[in-house]
């Protein structure tokens, strides 16, 4: 399943005026129409089957906040492998109800599992008409959590520039 770009459109009323906002997200397609998705103790289940994963060391971002993520390689039911990051197995979205993906909708998740605003949160299911495209190349990568955010050049992650996204 590809990493996809999709839009979330929100409408609200302020001062008698209707306001519409659009936010683009880039997340991995995890659930297709009619699939069931659940997280149990930090593990992903698709249609009741635990998705395989194996340890792949640790990852420490360049920011000096001292956080180290556990890194895993996850294998989706179609055989596609990708890396995921986790802080632990009892974080905010590590134990969810079963999500049943409605017809013509998709369930999206970020690869940084414990720090992702995705279908487990307020993004919810993504209607097919909100899919914008597939993400294939990392154009620009910035460490926004760097302590010295005023030094823009130092925050660019040059090793990720123009690299392929996927699978």
What residue ranges belong to the model's regions?
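Soluble "head" domains of membrane/secretory-pathway proteins
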Residues: 2-167
């Amino acid at each position: 399943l590809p990493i996809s770009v999709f839009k979330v459109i929100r409408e609200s009323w302020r001062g008698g005026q209707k306001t519409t906002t659009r936010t683009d997200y880039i997340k991995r397609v995890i659930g297709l129409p009619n699939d069931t998705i659940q997280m149990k103790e930090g593990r992903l289940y698709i249609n009741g089957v635990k998705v395989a994963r194996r340890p792949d060391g640790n990852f420490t971002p360049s920011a000096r906040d001292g956080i180290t993520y556990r890194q895993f390689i996850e294998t989706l039911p179609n055989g596609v492998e990708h890396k995921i990051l986790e802080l632990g197995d009892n974080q905010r979205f590590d134990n969810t109800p079963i999500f049943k993906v409605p017809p013509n909708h998709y369930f999206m998740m970020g690869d940084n599992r414990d720090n992702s605003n995705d279908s487990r949160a307020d993004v919810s299911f993504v209607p097919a008409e909100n899919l914008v495209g597939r993400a294939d190349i990392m154009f620009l990568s910035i460490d926004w959590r760097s302590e010295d955010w005023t030094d823009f050049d130092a925050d660019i992650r040059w090793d990720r520039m123009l690299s392929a996204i996927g699978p």
